[in-house]
């Protein structure tokens, strides 16, 4: 009824505007002004500014899938081609828990899999990650470091959480998925499409009451995830508030044959790329959404919102392909503990005005401050009892008896000294245990002297305690070989207590003699060295945004006008912290520490081990591989939905973006100087740079690392690197909507999009004898154009839409080999340099079908019995402008023996981000009482064809000749899954599979809802294409044994699994 009143009001206002009638003050009961129980942004099927003619909203919905919180009914007149809305109600009904579930029953869009760090954005129309926009409440989300150089150097080793952050599904009110160029809404990055989330609001729940309470519990077997969600909404007079607090606690997703190993020992022993079970991780997410609104009257509204979430992953990278081999006896693979975090915090303030003026019907001014941190911490150390650093074969341990600390063997017995009668060459006495077994080889009988070891009294209670020491010679240097209980002298260092047992001494012979006495410790350090990598990728955004909309009539045409602008500032930075510390610490490293010799004296050194006085912790400080870059973005936009006649409508949309990159340098978190020196301005041929600074040849200038000469070169190159860049782009989205009959709608769309290069693609620099990267401040923005035509046939609630599309991409950014370059003038030392350049263009074509058949439209007895079908088929290729430079030397070396390689190198490259042909069938039923219902989804995915896949490492895997440092050699072909690699086809691909999911709900009473589902009902074993293409050929994570294919099983999707939830609300 509100919408009907609004339509009448809009007509009246438009008529008054055309008649040049002055505007009057708006009455307080005006429906348009949205009373407090009405959301500011209404669901798609009930737009805030409802057009007079429903048809005028058609073009705006083209190419979009919307998820709205109020209804699942789709208005055909509002449906856009290629665009889908998924509602909070639908997500709850499907028991969605993450971004994978969001697109589980959609075609033409999937998530990007990365292994340990989970999903990283979406793949749409042949592009993925940063080329698909993601927005939450109008704010762009963090982008990955997309430079191929970064991915080659760092990403494959698991030291960075280089993924796009996700949103908590329980917070989502609507999710709008757009397939095709969409920079109009998402700005830079939306080349292939976008996914735009809107979070819930108190007014969504307070439609006809002043409070709402909901508590939801859920569980899913595929990762043992427990869900707890508490939702509170309330209104008191002019204030309203919403709180959504969600906790998820689970572990890794269980692959098919998850229980392949018979016991825990076999499980933990299965390490390296051949591991067939998913790595063990504990995964938790804590999310809190708070929104507070103040509406003094129906024309004004102030609101503040907090969206705070943390996703944490802890566990072991058992499939890690490289580990510190020196940390254990016979380990080929070491052990890596990981602790990844993805934190997002957004604070938003907004003001809205609903007073109608000649310039707007509704205006909204908002300010947002968003901080996103993606952290990856890895600890690499040997944490088993057999590790060399903690070796203790005799089981020595510390006990306390009657105020005396004692070191005893595994049988809780003392040691004793005896002569070794079996070794005539033995000097002195050897140490034996209570079983009369010689243990000197396993116990440190040469270290641990009393004057070099102190007791940590912060961890051991030293008050009135004694400790037995082992004395070989007394202060007169007579042989003793006995133990003796000594008092502990307590002292303090910086407020911390420690204990000391002094050596006895004698001056009887005219000079001082000390006894030979010691603590007896195992012959190892008592800890494993922990190699820590702690790396943060930070994205901090501040945004001011102004949105206005106006509806009016002009020249017999109805206009729905939206316009506005925004200013956005984003700082992207990296912090890299590498250090060593002690892990797997045993008692002799925990309770004792070294008294370190310094300048002839000994001082307490709590950071040094009691065994051999080794430094336990070392820290080189923080640095970064990327300079911090501030991005400033100025945006103006304009959109008009024009309904010319009852059968003809236009969409006219335009947006202007001006993106500026402002690089800077932080001396507190520096870039290693060696990455920048000599980058643009080379050292002179007479500069001595690399070598011993004390051995500078005659006639050369000392330019070694710490000299002013070196620092000056660094400053000069840094100044050249910190060059500002900017990008300007005009985005548009044009649509034509035709309704020639009451059962047919024809829609045409032409749109474009762009992606400005990321800061790492422009400014990243790296120098290494085997792989170096040159920055490029002259990169162009990537662009895309979308052309689509759609035919929708409909009747009542049933419809079928046939859509054909074409996406053209230009100026793809790619890492190009630019040849060897000297690192200093006249030097014979040359490094192979690479650089990001604009090279490729691509084209994707395809067709899509979306349909829904309400059986009740055919037979009245089958009311509430819908059938659905979705289908996507797409093909695409990347075409280079000539032969890619990286193939030049390879083809020259192999042109005689393998002439077929040139044809492979020159043919258009398949696009791995294109999904195989996919169909989704849906059949459902909702009882007339709405107390129960059931849905069945059947997903059929075709096999990824070999010709449509690409292996970027094929030149290093086929039989070939290669040159290393001017030396040619013949290299045989590598094998993949038992077969020799002969061309550029992808190594791992999915087979055709069909998966059936069944979900049901039951409402025994009004306030209680039970939902349960069986997923992969037939227990099908299958591998998705996105998981198959995530397998790495280089690096140390997400690897399999290429030759045999062992390890691929851990990437398979779960077998039959179950989900259930219960929700109580009132």
From Swiss-Prot:
It is found in: Cell outer membrane. It is a multi-pass membrane protein. Keywords: Cell outer membrane, Membrane, Receptor, Repeat, Signal, TonB box, Transmembrane, Transmembrane beta strand, Transport. Residues 1-24 form the signal peptide. InterPro entries: Plug_dom, Plug_dom_sf, PT, TonB-dep_rcpt-like, TonB-dep_rcpt_b-brl, TonB_rcpt_b-brl_sf, TonB_rcpt_CS. One of its GO terms (cellular component) is cell outer membrane. Residues 26-53 are annotated as: 7 X 4 AA tandem repeats of Q-P-T-N. One of its GO terms (molecular function) is siderophore uptake transmembrane transporter activity. PROSITE patterns: TONB_DEPENDENT_REC_2, TONB_DEPENDENT_REC_3. Coiled coil: none annotated. A motif (TonB box) lies at residues 63-70. Sequence repeats lie at residues 26-29, 30-33, 34-37, 38-41, 42-45, 46-49, 50-53. Belongs to the TonB-dependent receptor family. Hemoglobin/haptoglobin binding protein subfamily. Acts as a receptor for hemoglobin or the hemoglobin/haptoglobin complex of the human host and is required for heme uptake. This is Hemoglobin and hemoglobin-haptoglobin-binding protein C.
């Amino acid at each position: 009824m509100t919408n009907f009143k609004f339509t009448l009001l809009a007509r009246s206002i438009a008529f008054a505007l055309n008649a040049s009638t002055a505007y009057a003050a708006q009455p307080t009961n005006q429906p348009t002004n949205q009373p407090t129980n009405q959301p500011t942004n209404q669901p798609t099927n009930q737009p805030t500014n409802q057009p007079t003619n429903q048809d005028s909203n058609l073009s705006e919905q083209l190419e979009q899938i919307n998820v709205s919180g109020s209804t699942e009914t789709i208005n055909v007149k509002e449906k856009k081609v290629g665009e889908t809305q998924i509602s909070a109600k639908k997500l709850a009904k499907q028991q969605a828990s993450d971004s994978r579930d969001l697109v589980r029953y959609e075609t033409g869009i999937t998530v990007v899999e990365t292994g340990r760090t989970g999903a990283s954005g979406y793949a749409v129309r042949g592009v993925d990650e940063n080329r698909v926009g993601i927005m939450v409440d109008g704010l762009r989300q963090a982008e990955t470091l997309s430079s191929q150089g970064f991915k080659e150097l760092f990403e494959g080793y698991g030291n960075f959480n280089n993924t796009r952050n996700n949103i908590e599904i329980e917070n989502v009110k609507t999710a709008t998925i757009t397939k095709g160029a969409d920079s109009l809404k998402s700005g830079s990055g939306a080349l292939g499409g976008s996914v735009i989330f809107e979070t819930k609001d108190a007014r969504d729940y307070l439609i006809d009451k002043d409070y709402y309470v909901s508590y939801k519990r859920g569980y899913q077997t595929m990762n043992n995830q427990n869900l707890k969600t508490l939702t509170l909404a309330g209104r008191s007079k002019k204030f309203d508030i919403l709180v959504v607090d969600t906790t998820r606690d689970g572990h890794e997703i269980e692959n098919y044959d998850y229980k392949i190993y018979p016991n825990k020992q076999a499980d933990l022993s299965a390490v390296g790329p051949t591991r067939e079970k998913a790595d063990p991780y504990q995964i938790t997410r804590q999310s809190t959404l708070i929104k507070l609104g103040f509406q003094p009257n129906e024309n004004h509204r102030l609101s503040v919102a907090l969206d705070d979430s943390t996703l944490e992953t802890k566990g072991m990278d058992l499939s890690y392909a490289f580990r510190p081999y020196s940390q254990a006896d016979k380990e080929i693979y070491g052990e890596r503990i990981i602790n990844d975090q993805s934190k997002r915090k957004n604070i938003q303030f907004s003001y809205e005005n609903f007073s109608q003026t000649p310039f707007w019907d509704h205006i909204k001014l908002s300010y947002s401050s968003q901080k996103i941190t993606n952290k990856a911490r890895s600890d690499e150390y040997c944490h088993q009892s057999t590790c060399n650093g903690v070796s203790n074969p005799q089981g020595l341990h510390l006990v306390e008896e009657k105020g005396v600390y004692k070191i005893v063997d595994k049988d809780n017995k003392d040691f004793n000294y005896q002569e070794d009668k079996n070794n005539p060459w033995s000097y002195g006495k050897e140490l034996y245990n209570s079983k009369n077994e010689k243990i000197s080889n396993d116990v440190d009988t040469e270290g641990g002297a009393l004057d070099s070891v102190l007791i940590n009294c912060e961890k051991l209670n030293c008050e009135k305690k004694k400790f037995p020491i082992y004395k070989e010679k007394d202060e007169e240097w007579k042989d003793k070989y006995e133990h003796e209980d000594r008092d502990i002298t307590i002292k303090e260092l910086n407020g911390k207590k420690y204990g000391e047992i002094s050596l006895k001494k004698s001056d009887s012979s005219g000079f001082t003699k000390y006894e030979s006495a010691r603590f007896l410790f195992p012959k190892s350090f008592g800890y494993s060295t922990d190699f820590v990598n702690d790396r943060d990728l930070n994205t901090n955004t501040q945004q001011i945004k102004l949105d206005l909309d106006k509806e009016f009539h002009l020249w017999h045409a109805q206009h729905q006008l939206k316009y506005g602008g925004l200013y956005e500032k984003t700082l992207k930075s990296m912090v890299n912290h590498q250090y060593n510390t002690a892990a797997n610490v045993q008692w002799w490293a925990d309770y004792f520490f070294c008294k370190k010799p310094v300048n002839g004296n000994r001082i307490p050194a709590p950071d040094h081990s009691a065994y051999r006085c080794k430094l336990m912790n070392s820290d080189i400080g923080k640095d970064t591989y990327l300079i911090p870059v501030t991005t400033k973005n100025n945006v103006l936009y304009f959109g008009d939905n024009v309904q010319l006649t009852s059968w003809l409508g236009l969409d006219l949309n335009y947006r202007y973006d001006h993106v500026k990159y402002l690089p800077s340098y932080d001396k507190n978190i520096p870039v290693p100087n060696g990455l920048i020196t000599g980058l643009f301005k080379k050292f002179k041929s007479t500069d001595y740079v690399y070598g011993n600074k004390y051995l500078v040849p005659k006639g050369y200038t000392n330019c070694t690392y710490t000299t002013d000469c070196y620092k000056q070169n660094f400053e000069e190159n840094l100044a050249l690197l910190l060059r500002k860049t900017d990008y300007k782009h005009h985005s548009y989205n044009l649509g034509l909507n035709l309704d020639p009959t009451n059962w047919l709608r024809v829609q045409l769309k032409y749109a474009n999009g762009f992606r400005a290069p990321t800061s790492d693609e422009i400014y990243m620099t790296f120098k290494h004898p085997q792989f170096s990267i040159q920055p490029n401040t002259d990169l162009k923005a990537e662009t895309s154009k979308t052309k689509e035509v759609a035919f929708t046939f409909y009747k009542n609630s049933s419809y079928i839409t046939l859509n054909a599309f074409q996406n053209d991409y230009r100026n793809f950014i790619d890492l190009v080999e630019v040849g060897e370059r000297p690192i200093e003038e006249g030097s014979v030392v040359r490094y192979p340099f690479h650089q990001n350049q604009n090279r490729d263009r691509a084209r994707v074509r395809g067709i899509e079908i979306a349909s829904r058949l309400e059986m009740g439209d055919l037979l009245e007895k089958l009311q509430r019995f819908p059938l659905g079908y979705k289908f996507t088929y797409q093909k695409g290729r990347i075409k280079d402008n000539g032969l890619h430079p990286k193939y030049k030397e390879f083809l020259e070396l192999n042109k005689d023996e393998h002439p077929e390689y040139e044809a492979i190198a020159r043919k258009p490259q398949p696009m791995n981000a294109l999904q195989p042909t996919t169909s989704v069938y849906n059949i459902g039923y909702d009882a007339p009482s709405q107390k129960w219902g059931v849905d069945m989804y059947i997903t059929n995915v075709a096999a990824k064809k070999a010709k449509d896949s690409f292996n970027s490492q094929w030149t290093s895997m086929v039989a070939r000749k290669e040159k290393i440092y001017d030396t040619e050699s013949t290299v045989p072909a590598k094998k993949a899954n038992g077969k020799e690699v002969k061309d550029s086809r992808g190594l791992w691909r999915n087979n055709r599979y069909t998966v059936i999911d069944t979900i049901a709900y039951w409402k025994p009473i009004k306030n209680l809802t039970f939902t349960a589902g069986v997923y992969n009902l037939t227990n099908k074993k299958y591998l998705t294409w996105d998981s198959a293409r995530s397998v790495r050929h280089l690096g140390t994570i997400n690897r399999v044994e290429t030759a045999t294919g062992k390890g691929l099983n851990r990437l398979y999707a779960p077998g039959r699994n179950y989900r259930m939830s219960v929700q109580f609300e009132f």
